Swiss-Prot record:
It comes from Homo sapiens. Keywords: Chemotaxis, Cytokine, Disulfide bond, Glycoprotein, Inflammatory response, Secreted, Signal. Disulfide bonds join 32-57, 33-73. One of its GO terms (cellular component) is extracellular region. Belongs to the intercrine beta (chemokine CC) family. This is Eotaxin. GO terms for molecular function: CCR chemokine receptor binding; CCR3 chemokine receptor binding; chemokine activity; protein dimerization activity; receptor ligand activity. The gene is CCL11.
Length: 97
């Protein structure tokens, strides 16, 4: 029994000091979009947005947050998405990255 406990303890220590364990904030999961909205979202429903440009995601996207706290993924190449981002930038006092 002591051998099993010692082996378990050793495995836990090894996992804690592995490169993935030491990675810190970089190992935080990234939000990715797999389905993009096809229809324009009414501007009155939008509250904010963020861009998804991580190399870990299969595609670049914009995630709009609605006033009802829903996240909606959209294609940043679409004109309505660019217009919506511009609208939110003008509405917001702080610029988006």
């Amino acid at each position: 029994m002591k051998v099993s406990a010692a082996l378990l303890w050793l495995l836990l220590i090894a996992a804690a000091f592995s490169p993935q364990g030491l990675a810190g904030p970089a190992s935080v999961p990234t939000t990715c979009c797999f389905n993009l909205a096809n229809r324009k979202i009414p501007l009155q429903r939008l509250e904010s947005y963020r861009r998804i440009t991580s190399g870990k995601c299969p595609q670049k996207a914009v995630i709009f947050k609605t006033k009802l706290a829903k996240d909606i993924c959209a294609d940043p190449k679409k004109k309505w998405v660019q217009d919506s981002m511009k609208y939110l930038d003008q509405k917001s006092p702080t610029p988006k990255p």
